[in-house]
């Protein structure tokens, strides 16, 4: 499959590039920094690179791909995650392809006996005001996507902690609830998330839905 990875040089994006190549996909890595993409290409010489602001991507460019992965991150301007999702959706409205894949956050998952949102717990953490907009924006991004009916998309949320690391060969998989392993830990490695995302677009199970994975 022909796959475009937006935000390819980041932790999630680079792991997705690796997993997609392992699955036999033809991968194009997108980002604004030519230097970062060139470094990524040193690790994965078989990729193509497209150094360009994601907001400048055109419909014609997206239609060249079977899958477009949004692994974009903008910690200081997290609202851009919502804007980019809307931009990508706008470009492929009423098209059968590409399928849009969004890396979301854990804040939109539910937890506890009352099934409250994880973001509500995060908001109570010390100094949360300095970073809470990030999980809030990821929640709003998912809420927006849930109203999108004429575009093929799916979202994938990691668990409470999202860390760099290899894939778990036997990950936990869920839908709307925060996953916790047998040791009481809730974390997802970048490799686990990447493998789950690539598996989903090769073997679709979550059509216009979000799901979640965690290391067991």
Put a short name on every predicted segment.
Residues 36, 41-97, 205:
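NAD(P)H-binding glycine-rich loop region in Rossmannoid oxidoreductase-like domains
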Residues 77, 107-112, 161-165:
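Conserved catalytic-site region of short-chain dehydrogenase/reductase
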Residues 87-133:
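Conserved Rossmann-fold NAD(P)-dependent oxidoreductase catalytic core, especially the SDR/UDP-sugar
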Residues 25-32:
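Conserved glycine-rich Rossmann-like NAD(P)H-binding loop of the short-chain dehydrogenase/reductase
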Residues 143-163:
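Conserved beta-loop-beta element that borders a ligand/cofactor-binding pocket
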Residues 3-23:
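N-terminal Rossmann NAD(P)H-binding glycine-rich loop of SDR-like oxidoreductase domains
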Residues 114, 148-149, 163-170, 200-209:
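Glycine/proline-rich active-site loop of Rossmann-fold NAD(P)-dependent oxidoreductases
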Residues 137, 184-198, 209:
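Substrate-positioning beta->alpha
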């Amino acid at each position: 499959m022909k796959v475009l990875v937006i935000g390819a040089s980041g932790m999630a994006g680079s792991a997705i590039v690796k997993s997609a190549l392992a699955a036999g996909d033809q991968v194009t890595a997108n980002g604004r920094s030519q230097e970062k993409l060139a470094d990524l290409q040193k690790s994965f010489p078989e990729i193509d690179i497209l150094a360009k602001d994601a907001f400048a991507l055109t419909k014609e460019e997206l239609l060249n791909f079977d899958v477009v992965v949004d692994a974009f991150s903008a910690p200081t301007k997290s609202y851009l995650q919502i804007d980019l999702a809307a931009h990508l959706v706008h470009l492929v409205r009423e098209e059968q392809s590409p399928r849009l894949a969004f890396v979301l956050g854990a804040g939109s998952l539910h937890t506890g006996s009352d099934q409250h949102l994880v973001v509500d717990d995060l908001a109570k953490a010390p100094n949360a005001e300095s970073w809470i907009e990030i999980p809030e924006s990821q929640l709003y991004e998912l809420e927006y996507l849930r109203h999108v009916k004429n575009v093929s998309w799916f979202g994938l949320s990691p668990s409470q902690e999202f860390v760099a690391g290899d894939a778990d060969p036997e990950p936990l998989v869920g839908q709307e609830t925060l996953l916790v392993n047998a040791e009481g830990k809730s974390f997802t490695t970048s490799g686990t998330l990447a493998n789950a995302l690539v598996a989903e677009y090769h073997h679709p199970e979550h059509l216009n839905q979000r799901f979640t994975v965690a290391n067991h």
